[in-house]
């Protein structure tokens, strides 16, 4: 699957530094755009809201967070609020991290997303 060379959108100036890499990767995916993100600030878990209208992208993202193929610390949930009519999802850490553990887990997640979006998996994921 083709990942764009650069993100489709510019992140807001107040984006948490720890969120920039994962948001940029998600924004490079087809039919996908981040909406909000937060690194947690020691009060809650790291999370990113994103819109996606491509089932193949969602399937690969699901594989990237699947505990069989990752550290198992991440999940993707459907955002079922009234704010968005459809296609909004919530990528979040399952628990809070100290800063160094969070950075390590986010880096592993980013690497894992890029791994599963490699062209070698196109036949496995295209609908």
Task: State where each predicted segment sits.
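Structured alpha/beta or helical-core interaction and ligand-binding surfaces enriched in interleaved
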Residues: 1-127
